[in-house]
Amino acid sequence: MGFLPIKPILPINPIHAQDTNRVLLHVDGSTFFIDNEYFGDRISGYTLPGFVLQPKMEWVFDAHRDVKLKGGLHWLYYWGAQDFPARTAYGAYPLYDSMSRPMHVLPWLQASIKFNSKLKLYLGCLDPDGHDLPLPLYSPELALVGDPETGFQIKFNGNWLKMDIWTDWREYIWNRSPVPERFTAGASGRLVLNHKDWQFYLPLHFVVQHEGGQNMSVSHNINNNFNAAAGLGLYSLIGENFYYDISCRAFWYHQHGNPAVPFSTGWGLYPEVKTCLYNRWILSASYWHGKDFVPLMGCWHFSNLSANTAGLTFDRTRVVTLQASWMKSYPTWPRKCHLVIYGTLYHYLPSTGTFADGTTKDYGHRNQFAVGAALNFYPSIKLF
């Protein structure tokens, strides 16, 4: 679950009145190789070699209000995979399932409308941008190899407030279904104070995962898990080739309902320094200190619950994270393709683990690392 900038911030082509009924073909995708070298009782390592492809047609229904309809397919493939789990939603690393299918292909459909210059609504597949969530709340691998988020999304981009509110429906419930409904909802934003050379901001994040439903024919246990974070940040742009971003966030975890993990409430603290050089290099350093914290969509290195050893918990999770990535966009194919190479080092500080049977084990310093490369492409062709 390393640092992987999936898609750069790109200028958006302006929509003009004459673009009504315009039809375009988009071919968004990425071919990637990710090697997560993780060892020990906390999290297992894994390798992700493959590609994701999203061919889509876009119809500009009303250029005045920027009303668009996009439809296509989402295709994920791992090199060497003979079959794919059929009964699970795909996250960063899907679980094995005895029921399989020869490929993993999903429909992709999105309708969007822009109410004004600041407010936009998405229905269907959501914007795959990570919702501006920090690493403990969102693993960037989800934007690459996870199933598309589906539901609704509202984005507000004002001068002093930026907000993303969404619901991602993961499991639909049928009448008399033995499977409960599952969805994730969240709100992520920041209050900003702009100056000529810097920006002071207050980041606010909230994520809830719900499992249950109102099917009266079948009894479902209801469980809600919450992540939240708030903090302070300072962003400064120095010239055209350098910026730095300093922030500190406090995190909160809470579980309500049928217990699925041994923690009811937990917390974490996460200071981070990030810089970008010449629009190529992104470097960051951070420190995490957490107790009884479980990341719902985030990087599992920050969890106090083991991902590979049932019932194992840690009294404290303290992690120093160093990240570096290099990006290259090719001017011969502007705004259509870029290469990313990255590496992440996680240094664990000593902690004590407690197993399900009550026995304890002391863990010393340990290093884990992840490296990867991705060639991201998103050409567009105007059909008529």
Model-identified regions with their sequence ranges:
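Exposed, low-structure sequence patches enriched in small/polar residues
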Residues: 28-30, 50, 108, 160-166, ...
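Subset of outer-membrane beta-barrel
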Residues: 60-63, 99-120, 124-129, 157, ...
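Beta-barrel outer-membrane channel/assembly domains of diderm bacteria
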Residues: 6-102, 107-113, 274, 368-374
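Flexible, solvent-exposed loop segments that connect beta-strands
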Residues: 39-42, 85-97, 135-136, 302-308, ...
